């Protein structure tokens, strides 16, 4: 009886181990950690231009002025753990200085922000191993749509959350609304990763694979925020070594860790589809054997 149970358990866990082995093989072949380092470097160069472009778009729409402030606090509170206040002051100072630039300098900011989009596009298509290239005009349209519509959608989602928060004080659904607001960052991360894995690759991505990969990435991202904040709080070695400059390596490490999570979610999405194809091919070979 015990042997039968062990055989069944081994039979059920065998596909999981095979999939994990395939996932590890792809991570190694794609040099995921090196790719994450490249994206982190480009992200740090593009951070101020990207933020400047985003808040310039909000400034162009007066109805989003209040939402712009909420979005700013939401980003620094939920995407830059532990040191968000310090980084926020520096970035806002840099953005304020960038507003004094000429038209040529503003165009340079936009180009730098688009460079980040291009790097993300290239990295994800390298993971999907897609050799099909989009037309340049189409790629530019996609990048510009992300730059313009992305912040506006985020602002709209924050407006909805503010509306729910106002309902909290005027209804008997306090518990439900509290739970929705508590998981709101996770839902926003999940939707963002799902859109990233579905739209950016130049080949068709099965929707269920993108949903699973995005959910794992969102969970890791939320857990990573809490773990990273706990590490910075409990083991303040960076502050002891770097002093007032500690915010710089902390930002570097966090951006690198974030890109590792994003690329891992992409690898999971790809591996789900690849493993399914390999399994179907193996079953087909067994059926063809006499």
UniProtKB/Swiss-Prot annotation:
Assigned GO CC terms: plasma membrane
Source species, domain of life: Bacteria
UniProt-listed InterPro entries: UPF0761_bac, Virul_fac_BrkB
Disulfide bridge partners, by residue number: none
Compartments where found: Cell inner membrane
Membrane topology classification: Multi-pass membrane protein
Transmembrane residue ranges: 44-64, 104-124, 140-160, 183-203, 210-230, 244-264
Key words, A-Z: Cell inner membrane, Cell membrane, Membrane, Transmembrane, Transmembrane helix
Record-stated family: Belongs to the UPF0761 family.
Protein name stated in the entry: UPF0761 membrane protein YihY
Organism lineage: Bacteria, Pseudomonadati, Pseudomonadota, Gammaproteobacteria, Enterobacterales
